[in-house]
Amino acid sequence: MAQVYSQEVYVQYLKRYGFVFQSSELYNGLANSWDFGPLGAVLKQQIKTALYNFFIKNKRDVLLIDTPIILNEQIWKASGHLANFTDALVDCKSCKLRFRVDHLDEQIKSATQWNPKQVNCPNCKANNWSEVRDFNLLFQTEIGVVNSEKRLVYLRPETAQGIFINFKQLLQLKKRPLPFGVAQFGKSFRNEVTPGNFLFRVREFEQFEMEWFCNPQASLSVFESQQQAIAHFLFKVLQLNPALVKQYEYDKNELAHYANKTVDFLFQFPHGLRELWGLADRGTFDLEQHQKYAKKPLDFFDGENNEHFIPAVVEPSVGIERLFYALIVSSYQQEQLEGEMREVLRLPFHLCPEQIVVLPLVNKLKETAQTLFEALSQTHWRIGFESAGSIGKRYRKADAIGTKFAITFDFESLEDQAVTIRERDSLKQVRVPIKELKAWFAQHDDQSH
């Protein structure tokens, strides 16, 4: 298995190079809140672009929508979130810390399985627990200006419900057959009582969710198709290390209240093997619930078989921050090179925040190298320019932030109009004429995945 470092290694690395840092740091921070810096914001955007290109772009049976964070509060009643979206928590009476029951014992799938006599507090080692209590994870807020007219609403805990409530409109808009998918990117919010483990569990996060509407008899076929698609995306597009990923199918007694079948793609994060991407057969639960509460029909008419039915839903759901974190863990390595520690981020070329960097060998060549940088900046590639420091230190920085190719503009370049290209992973160097650079990079672009 590839080496997985401690969480602190990744936190410090990402902060050092401006990928991710503590949010509100000027005011001593806010727990479990993170800002994406210049490199992190670009990498996050490239992950979203890769998701869009693979799952949505040019797919005749997939639609992309964008719905609000605040929805009619009745939606959360219909979906079951008001009643069921809770964590079972206990307090250690000795040290006053609060824990999720399922985090104290991973064998526990429901609060009814909790046996306090068998578990000691991980902080103070005492065995002095409070009663189990359920805490709802929905963030509450109000809309309205006048106090007497204010209305209680919730920040969405998932993007899925915004898709379900638009099913009929999308169906009528396109008159499309089943199955078809609807995708959405967007922020979601969960009032996690015990968030933590860096980007893995935060209160505000971005999701990519798809809802595949299908005939209930075809849901297994759709499920298996999406399972294969997720695996392809993780291993071929993001190029995650397969040794760090495991698929886990839930037993019947582990399933969420809405699910008929669930498979999680688990990833070896620093704190353990945890969920990266969930795939669930939600059955007909969602549309039936919204039909019941809205009192409006959400059925589908199958003209070929002359029958009406409520479609089943198959849902792939992933958090962008978790994908980001997994990509860093899978790609980041520390190794010895020429007696020094080399940090390298082995990202696929299409994901690199900075794909190519232009490096003048010395300051005297800076102006001419700048002309080359400006020419390459007219292409679709993400180009950087670095002139400060020795060429060796600039190579090290480029490796650390994942830059795939470094172009060195030296004194010979003035004479032969060629430059040296150094490849990040193999460290091989090749001399390429400047006039052929665009063609050379086009040949080495992995965008065709």
Swiss-Prot record:
Transmembrane segments: none
EC number: 6.1.1.14
GO annotation terms (biological process): glycyl-tRNA aminoacylation
GO annotation, cellular component aspect: cytoplasm
GO molecular function, one term: protein dimerization activity
Binding site for substrate: R100, E158, F205, E206, Q207, F208, E209, E315, P316, S317, V318, G319
Reaction catalyzed: tRNA(Gly) + glycine + ATP = glycyl-tRNA(Gly) + AMP + diphosphate
Locations listed in the record: Cytoplasm
Main location: cytoplasm
Function: Catalyzes the attachment of glycine to tRNA(Gly).
Name of the protein in question: Glycine--tRNA ligase
Origin species: Mycoplasma pneumoniae (strain ATCC 29342 / M129 / Subtype 1) (Mycoplasmoides pneumoniae)
Organism taxonomic ancestry: Bacteria, Bacillati, Mycoplasmatota, Mycoplasmoidales, Mycoplasmoidaceae
